[in-house]
């Protein structure tokens, strides 16, 4: 789902009807008319595991090693991504776990690299998957207990010529 603001789908479903669960939605600043550097998706952290309630599973190394890939298709293209970071980050600039989500959406290479490094630094586990600022990212974001904290799962698009089998071996060595 996409809209001009990031609040509507917090309490409306995909059909636009009021719903306490909301919907998973694309950041309002990201358009689908061109290929964005980053798909930034938000959803509620439901205790039932619905919406993005299951993102916490990626912080479990056994879960991640079993299937480190995410499929994300748009109406324009199919996408396969490999997870490189999962953990809790902060939107508070003074925090040591701060991630600049605006930089992830930017074309500024230095800012993107800093944001990628912050995601990797806040990850629950270290990972051997390399990530370049030119890579297309998929970042799934949900809330946690503290208002300024967010649970994230960050993945990069699998590059042309890369094999999922080789990437999975890298994952098994590191997590």
Model-identified regions with their sequence ranges:
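Solvent-exposed, non-transmembrane regions of membrane-associated and secreted proteins
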Residues: 1-175
């Amino acid at each position: 789902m996409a809209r001009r603001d990031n609040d509507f789908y917090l309490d409306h479903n995909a059909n636009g009807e009021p719903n306490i669960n909301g919907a998973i939605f694309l950041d309002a600043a990201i358009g689908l008319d061109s290929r964005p550097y980053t798909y930034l998706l938000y959803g509620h952290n439901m205790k039932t595991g619905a919406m993005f309630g299951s993102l916490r599973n990626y912080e479990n190394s056994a879960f991640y090693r079993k299937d480190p890939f995410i499929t994300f298709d748009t109406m324009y293209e199919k996408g396969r991504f490999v997870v490189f970071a999962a953990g809790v980050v902060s939107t508070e600039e003074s925090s040591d776990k701060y991630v600049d989500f605006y930089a992830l959406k930017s074309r500024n290479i230095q800012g993107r690299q800093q944001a990628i490094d912050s995601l990797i630094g806040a990850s629950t586990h270290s990972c051997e998957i390399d990530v370049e600022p030119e890579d297309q990212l998929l970042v799934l974001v949900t809330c946690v207990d503290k208002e300024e904290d967010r649970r994230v799962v960050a993945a990069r698009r699998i590059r042309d010529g890369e094999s999922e089998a080789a990437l999975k071996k890298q994952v098994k060595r590191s997590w």
